[in-house]
A protein has these predicted regions:
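Glycine-rich phosphate- or other oxyanion-binding loops that anchor nucleotides, phosphorylated ligands
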Residues: 2, 26-136
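N-terminal beta1-alpha1 ligand-phosphate binding loop
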Residues: 3-25
C-alpha cells in the first residue's frame, strides 16, 4: 500500500513521522519518504494556504497512491477541536478569503464583502464547467 500524507508544515505531522522509518528527505524536496511496517508513505509538505496545497499536491499526484490524507490544522480556526481529532469534511469555504483582527478570523461576510464571495463562487463554477470539457 502507498499513502500520500499532505500537510502544510512538518511540525503538524511530527507525531506521525516519529512512528515511521524515514527513508529519504532531501533539504530541497517537499516530500519526506518513509515507511511504517510494509506501508510506503510519502509526506508532502506544501506550505500554508490553499493555493500552495493545491499546487504542490497536483505536482505529486502523477504517482499512484492508494490513499491520500490531508493532515494538520487544514486551515481550521475551530479551537473546540481536540488535537488528534479525525474530521470528515462535508462542506468547505474559501478560508483564505477574509482577515484576522488580532483575536479572531473575520469572514468575507463579517467584512461586508459577500458580493465578492458570490462573484468568486460563480466564477469558480464557470471554471469547473469549462474544465469538464477539456481532454483528459
Amino acid at each position: 500500500m502507498k499513502i500520500l500524507i499532505v500537510a502544510a508544515t512538518k511540525f503538524e505531522i511530527n507525531p506521525l513521522l516519529s512512528l515511521t522509518e524515514i527513508i529519504s528527505f532531501a533539504e530541497n524536496s517537499r516530500v519526506i519518504k518513509c515507511s511504517y511496517k510494509k506501508i510506503e508513505i510519502d509526506c508532502l509538505i506544501t506550505g500554508v494556504g490553499m493555493v500552495a496545497t493545491a499546487f504542490y499536491t497536483a505536482e505529486v499526484l502523477n504517482k499512484s497512491y492508494d490513499l491520500a490524507i490531508n493532515m494538520g490544522i487544514c486551515g481550521t480556526f475551530n479551537n473546540n477541536l481536540d488535537i488528534g481529532s479525525v474530521i470528515h469534511i462535508y462542506e468547505d469555504q474559501f478560508a483564505e478569503m477574509g482577515a484576522e483582527d488580532g483575536e479572531k478570523f473575520l469572514s468575507m461576510e463579517d467584512l461586508k464583502l459577500e458580493a465578492i464571495t458570490k462573484i468568486t463562487n460563480e466564477a469558480q463554477s464557470e471554471i469547473y464547467a469549462l474544465l469538464e470539457h477539456l481532454p483528459k
